[in-house]
Amino acid sequence: MAYTNKVTISAAVATMMLFLAVTIVDAQSMPPMPKFNPVCALADLPNIVQLCYFNLDLTPSEECCNDLKSSSTIQVNCLCDNFIAHPSNGNISQARYDLVNSACGVADKFACKGGDASGGSTNKIAASMVLLGLVASLFF
């Protein structure tokens, strides 16, 4: 009669049952995460958003307006794609964006309507190449 280790077999069966249970059970559906452009991680967005839009003053500060006026094309595209065109990403209303942008005189610069305007049309292939270059520079 062959010797079988019951502990090993029972551990293997328990592990198999655990994996089957995980695959059979339906996962809770999570709300879709916004697609974040990797180039936007390099743009200094948190400071601009915090300084200008999370502040509840009726008139934006001079520093806020200067930051908005001197923001680069990448920053404008990232703000349009991730915050202004989708206000639910930052829990800031569209009226707040409009108020701050109008008060600072940059309403035309930040005029993006859900991605159909010219703002926010970042080239995805170029962004992925930049990310690939950054990752490759870490290894070589």
Swiss-Prot record:
Glycans are attached at residue 91. A lipid is attached at residue 115 (GPI-anchor amidated glycine). SUPFAM superfamilies: Bifunctional inhibitor/lipid-transfer protein/seed storage 2S albumin (SSF47699). Keywords: Cell membrane, Disulfide bond, Glycoprotein, GPI-anchor, Lipoprotein, Membrane, Signal. Disulfide bonds join 40-80, 52-64, 65-104, 78-112. Probable lipid transfer protein. The keyword Glycoprotein applies. It comes from Arabidopsis thaliana. The lineage of its organism: Eukaryota, Viridiplantae, Streptophyta, Embryophyta, Tracheophyta. Belongs to the plant LTP family. One of its GO terms (cellular component) is side of membrane. This is Non-specific lipid transfer protein GPI-anchored 33.
